[in-house]
């Protein structure tokens, strides 16, 4: 009795250079969560830039008119209005939070299935969005008042005289609304990453 098995050798040229068509399946379960975490980090960096730009732009908003009298100098500055002061402080807090949240976003990339950092980010992002929206809404009301005035109160708009001041303030408000939109999108991404599937 022989334990020998004869296997015919295929010596054709076509069979020698081909590899088997069966590939190993390396599908990682939850791979989309890592992709969401990377997208979260990129958006978070964008939100830092826009929130910081809004705070810095409003904080440097001032204009002095070239004409003045012996007793008066006509000047407009962000610290003349408490609403703009609140805007600068609130946007600085939001941008500071966003910088401090970057390590948690990196942890979410390294450990995409961890729910603790995601839950913390979704709660604090909601607080930051609320503060950002409050500051932006208050500032847009003052910018509108500066541009159009209020005929009922007999207030005239000042943007005809202080054009640079109004332009910089409007730019800061637009940047803050962009930051609010990015924060809202970050909350949606965190909610998607917290799903069980």
Swiss-Prot record:
Residues 57-85, 141-171 are extracellular. Its main location: membrane. It comes from Populus trichocarpa. One of its GO terms (biological process) is cell-cell junction assembly. This is Casparian strip membrane protein 3. The keyword Protein biosynthesis does not apply. GO terms for cellular component: Casparian strip; plasma membrane. Keywords: Cell membrane, Cell wall biogenesis/degradation, Glycoprotein, Membrane, Transmembrane, Transmembrane helix. The chain crosses the membrane at residues 36-56, 86-106, 120-140, 172-192. Residues 1-35, 107-119, 193-197 are cytoplasmic.
């Amino acid at each position: 009795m022989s334990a020998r098995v004869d296997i015919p050798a295929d010596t054709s040229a076509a069979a020698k250079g081909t590899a088997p068509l069966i590939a190993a399946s390396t599908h990682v379960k939850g791979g989309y969560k890592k992709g969401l975490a990377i997208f979260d980090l990129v958006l978070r960096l964008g939100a830092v830039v826009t929130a910081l730009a809004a705070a810095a732009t409003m904080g440097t908003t001032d204009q002095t008119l070239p004409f003045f009298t012996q007793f008066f100098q006509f000047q407009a500055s962000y610290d003349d209005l408490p609403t703009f002061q609140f805007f600068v402080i609130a946007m600085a807090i939001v941008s500071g939070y966003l910088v401090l949240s970057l390590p948690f976003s990196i942890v979410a990339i390294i450990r995409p299935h961890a729910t603790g950092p995601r839950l913390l980010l979704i709660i604090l992002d909601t607080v930051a969005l609320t503060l950002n929206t409050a500051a932006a809404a208050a500032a847009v009301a003052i910018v509108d008042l500066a541009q159009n005035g209020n005929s009922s109160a007999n207030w005239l708009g000042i943007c005809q005289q202080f054009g640079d001041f109004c332009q910089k303030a409007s730019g800061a408000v637009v940047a803050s609304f962009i930051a609010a939109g990015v924060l809202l999108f970050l909350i949606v991404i965190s909610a998607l990453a917290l799903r069980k599937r």
